[in-house]
Each structure stands twice: as C-alpha cells, then as structure tokens.
C-alpha cells in the first residue's frame, strides 16, 4: 500500500496479474493463416453461390480465380508453417486434442470438470474443422480439375462443397461469439493474438493445464 502524492490518503496498489504462456508463434501463425484464408474463401464462395450476391458483385470469372488461388495459397501457407515452425509443439497439440478423458466427458455434460490446455469443446471444434478442411480440399479439387478433365468430374461434389460451407459458417459464428462477445470466454482471444492469458482466467477455464504450468515454475 502507498500514499497518493500530495495527500495523506492511502492508495491501494493492484496486485500484478500473472500471465501464462498459451500459444507459441507457430500455433498463432497457423491459426491466423487458416482464419484469414477461410474468410476470403467464404466471401468469394458466397458470391459465387448466392444468385443475389453474384448479380450484385458480378465478375464471376475473377471471383472463381480468387477462390481457387486463395485455396492454393492457403494450403501452401499451412504446409510452410508446419515445415518451418515448431513441429514438436504442433504434434503435442495433435496428441492432446485427440485424447479425451473422463474430465472431458464430464465437461460436455456440463459438470464443470477441470480442463487441460484445450477443453472438450475446443478439441471437438479442432477435429471438425480439420475434417472440414480436408473435405473442402477434396471436393474443391474435383470441382476445379473436373472442369479440365471430365474423368475427374465427381457427381455431387458441388452439393457436398455447399453443405460444408453451411456447416463451417455456423461453426465460425459460434467460434466468433465465444472469442469476441461472451464475457466469460473472450479473454481467450489474448492467447491467440498475444500468446498469453491471465492466470486467474486459466485457472477457471483450464485448471489442469494452469496448475501443471505453475508447478513447473
């Protein structure tokens, strides 16, 4: 406790907030490469898919080129980040995301079980997002190359591609709500932008991870 200069009134000094390192530079780069490409692909895809938007924007051949070349750049950038970045950290992430324990099942049943670095919802979101990315790439290849070689034209590829877009759209809406709007969870954005989160927040939302990290210190 200190005193305000020029007065006898005591001034309470707020305790220093401890920060816990959450995401590495490689993890953050991978996330933002995927996110930025997704929004370009979603925007150009909607303009190609919705007649009202297609008529408003026009220039359909240019939109198709933007869509295709953004997809190619997205795949190349993801590969570059994985090859040039911290692969050991990414592999550890994959192992943790793929492992579900009793606390994860309890969390899904809203029992408030303590969570690790990724909660059960984040694990499911990552698995679904990865599956969607793979299916988008697969159906997108058949749509693009099928126009050039009819032997690769896959029936219903466009229908599947469109349905993947619907699923992704609503998945991203939920993701944006939790990371930008919901007061309880929006501090998580700090982890993926600045690489750290407050210890008090981590203890509330990822208690097992936070406790393990503080024990290492």
Where are these predicted regions, by residue range?
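Membrane-embedded alpha-helical bundles that constitute the cytochrome b-like, heme-associated redox core
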Residues: 1-217
């Amino acid at each position: 406790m200190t005193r305000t200069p020029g007065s006898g009134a005591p001034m309470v000094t707020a305790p220093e907030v401890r920060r816990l390192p959450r995401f590495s530079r490689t993890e953050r780069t991978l996330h933002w490469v995927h996110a930025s490409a997704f929004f370009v692909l979603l925007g150009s895809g909607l303009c190609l898919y919705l007649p009202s938007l297609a008529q408003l924007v026009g220039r359909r051949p240019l939109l198709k080129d933007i869509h295709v070349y953004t997809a190619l750049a997205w795949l190349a950038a993801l590969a570059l980040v994985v090859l040039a970045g911290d692969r050991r950290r990414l592999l550890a992430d994959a192992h943790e995301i793929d492992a579900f324990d009793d606390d994860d099942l309890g969390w899904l049943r809203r029992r408030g079980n303590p969570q690790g670095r990724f909660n059960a919802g984040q694990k499911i979101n990552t698995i679904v997002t990865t599956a969607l990315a793979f299916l988008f790439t697969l159906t997108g290849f058949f749509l693009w190359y099928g126009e050039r070689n009819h032997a690769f034209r896959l029936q219903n590829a466009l229908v599947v591609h469109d349905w993947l877009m619907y699923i992704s759209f609503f998945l991203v809406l939920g993701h944006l709500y939790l990371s930008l709007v919901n007061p309880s969870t929006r501090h998580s954005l700090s982890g993926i932008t600045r690489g750290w989160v407050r210890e008090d927040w981590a203890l509330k939302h990822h208690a097992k991870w936070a406790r393990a990290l503080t024990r290492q210190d």
